[in-house]
Amino acid sequence: MPDDPAPAPAAEAPAQELPKPRPKDEPETVVALREMIEGKLATLGGYLVDNHGNYVLGLQTARTFVVPTWLENGATVVRVFAITNLAVPVTAELTQWLLEKNLEFVFGAFALDVENGAIWFNHNLLGQFAAPEELEATIAAVIETANRFDDEIKTRFGGRLYVEGAEGVVPPPAAPGYL
């Protein structure tokens, strides 16, 4: 046996995980909720984390966000939402259509950010009672609904899809009337 044995093969260096951003003073209950969310999202094919600590799923044409947060009373909430459209002219017809659609949904609802002409589809869960299977079903419902209606909203009311640049803005269709 030689005095200077060959070195053992080097083990692969562990993948370095970048620290994920977290809101300042995030309670331990939200940290625990994040562990459940991250575990479930990892089984769904991956995710990104934005600068605010929100989880982002870039599936299809509507980005979906999963946002764990807390209320002043200590309760935790998981907000799951997709921003479907931007730069949509806000009209009475649009708001009526959104409200009528909301009556059809079992889970979730459309919301309108008037200032940005943004349409969201969202559903919230009570974090302290949320189970991984419930989170998965909620994410699936939000993604499916957002992708089902985003093109229709663009065609009927103008604006653009969330994933399109400003060059994708479609003017609203001409209103029938006098001329």
Would you name each region that the model predicts?
Residues 1-65:
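Charge-rich, low-complexity N-terminal segments
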Residues 27, 31, 88-92, 129-136:
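Ordered, soluble secondary-structure elements with a strong preference for glycine-centered loop motifs
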Residues 47-53, 70-74, 112-116:
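Short, ordered beta-strand-loop transition motifs
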Residues 65-87:
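A short acidic-to-branched-hydrophobic micro-motif
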Residues 79-122:
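Short, internal acidic amphipathic alpha-helical interface segments
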Residues 114-145:
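A short, solvent-exposed beta-edge/loop patch
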Residues 137-159:
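A conserved amphipathic terminal alpha-helix motif
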Residues 153-179:
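Short, highly charged C-terminal tails/helix-capping segments
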